[in-house]
Regions:
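Amphipathic alpha-helical repeat scaffolds of TPR domains
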Residues: 172-174
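Repetitive helical segments and hydrophobic/amphipathic motifs
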Residues: 12-13
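C-terminal motif of bacterial Sec signal peptides marking the signal peptidase cleavage site
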Residues: 16-20
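Bacterial N-terminal signal peptides that target proteins for export
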Residues: 1-8
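A non-transmembrane, solvent-exposed segment enriched in polar/low-complexity residues
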Residues: 21-167
Length: 174
């Protein structure tokens, strides 16, 4: 009887071991320069808000690696140190590699392994440029309130048109 229990236990543990080895995962890895001793957070951007998935205190080389169970539908994550954020899209079991430089990692980074992540970076940079344009218009002392409103509307409409034609209409089902 104890031999049967031992054999069953061994078989169950072996099956569990194989299942865990075969678990499909995605990977986010890379390095962030100039961020030694900073805490890098890997966060899920879900419908219930931001949830921390994992974190790591970066060493002198800034290397990091996170992974998670493969997703059935694309999900958004972000890498964050303080107020600096890099948005990442995960689809299936891909490996996304990020190389960045702190403290300007939100704008000074490279991403590979995902076309979606590259597009997200382009859109984030475009949005930052839009915000800068709006701020410059609002601070212009030569413009009255109506001229500011008109100018802001024009740059926002130009931004929307650009996003529609270069991203949405280009791949409407993506």
């Amino acid at each position: 009887m104890t031999k049967k229990i031992a054999a069953f236990t061994f078989a169950a543990l072996t099956a569990l071991g194989f299942a865990s080895c075969n678990e499909r995962k995605f990977h986010v890895e890379g390095a962030i320069e100039n961020a030694a001793d900073s805490v890098l957070y890997f966060e899920n951007m879900g419908l219930n808000g931001v949830q921390t998935v994992d974190s790591v205190k970066l060493s002198a080389d800034g290397a990091f690696a996170f992974d998670g169970k493969a997703v059935t539908a694309p999900e958004f994550y972000r890498l964050r140190i303080a107020g600096q954020i890099i948005n990442v899209a995960i689809d299936s079991t891909e490996t996304v590699t990020v190389k960045a430089k702190y403290p300007a990692m939100a704008t000074d980074y490279e991403v590979s392994g995902s076309d979606d992540c590259s597009r997200i970076k382009e859109l984030a940079l475009m949005q930052m440029q839009l915000q800068q344009s709006v701020n410059n218009i609002a601070r212009n002392p030569l413009l009255g309130a109506d001229a500011v409103a008109d100018s802001v509307q024009k740059v926002v409409e130009a931004y929307k048109t650009d996003v529609k034609t270069r991203y949405i209409f280009k791949q409407p089902m993506k």
